[in-house]
Curated annotation (Swiss-Prot):
Locations listed in the record: Cytoplasm; Membrane; Golgi apparatus; Mitochondrion intermembrane space
Role noted for this protein: Induces mitochondrial fragmentation, possibly by promoting DNM1L-dependent fission and may play a role in mitochondrial morphogenesis during spermatogenesis.
Positions with biased composition (Basic and acidic residues): 254-263
Record's protein name: Gametogenetin-binding protein 1
UniProt lineage: Eukaryota, Metazoa, Chordata, Craniata, Vertebrata
Organism in which the protein naturally occurs: Rattus norvegicus
Amino acid sequence: MAAQARTPRSRILGCSSMLRFLRSLVGSKGSSKSSNRPLNRSQPSSSPEQDVVSPTMGHQGGCGRKETRPRVLSATSSNGKREPRPRVLSAAPSNQRLRDASGLGTGDTGSQTLTSKDVLKLRAQGVEVTSVPTRGTWEVLEHLPEKKGEEGEPAGEVSGASDRAHFGQALEAEQGCLQWVSGPMVLPPEAFIKEEEDEHCLIDFGDLRLSSCKVGSTPWNYLLGLYKQLQKSAMTKAQRPDADAPQFALKDSSPTEERGEREEAVDESSLKWCAPRASSDDSNLKWCAPRNSTYQSPLQKTFRSTDTVGFVESELKKILAVQREARLWKVGNPEGRELLTQPDITLEEAGMVDGQHLLLEEMDEMGNWPPPE
């Protein structure tokens, strides 16, 4: 009866005390939700679940608004022990810097999928991370502590802030070092130009074919070099005496020759021409130039025994370029030298025999003949 006889004021006071109690409960729940709470060790559900969190990166690398609150479910293994489940996080674009590797403000870590073509498996206390295997990433990840903690310990408490910092450095090194190019390898056309230039070229100009044309030489330069080589070979052949032509050796006008033939000693200024001997086999006269002769050797001239003295004298003047008056002597006979004064007689009629010579004597500048010896 006393409870039923309560006044409205007492009811209002009771409701207010109840409201204060509820407010205190709600406030404690809200504060516990805002703090870093440990992982829920509830029983696993029949189907495996994974909470997906996609943080939005700002211009300075900070994490933005989170779409869903991450949940961590611990699975129970066959032996009754609980094992933490991996998390899957969607990371920001590769050109932005990641300061928090896990993408969460809390202490739990997860796994990030960077790009579809990069694969890296990092195992740190039940957490799987897929990323790109680069050299810089491996060097950073080698220093990550891999500790085997208790099987039922939450994953966020095991990794800690140091793991997140190391993993963030690995991602930064990966973004700076990794540059993969998809598709087939494309070679620029400049790579084939050098190979074509290194090859030998074949130039066809009608009947003239030039092969093995090296790099850096133009066809004109090659033709010019070929012409110079042909010119040199032609000059070399021209300097050689002809095998079919008769060979005439030049002899010095000395008193005694190697063959024992005696030649009359005369003044060198008057000595212009010498015919060594008349051969009876071919009826030809062979001659030699004296030592003081300024003409280049070999000088070749053939006279027959039927040629006249005047013809021989005129030919010798042309060859020796004698401008003044000259006369022809026959030397080598026992009586001494003999002057040939009849230009109409032949050499055979003049008595030219084997062992005799012809001497062309020129008048000096004063118009005098050289004195006889």
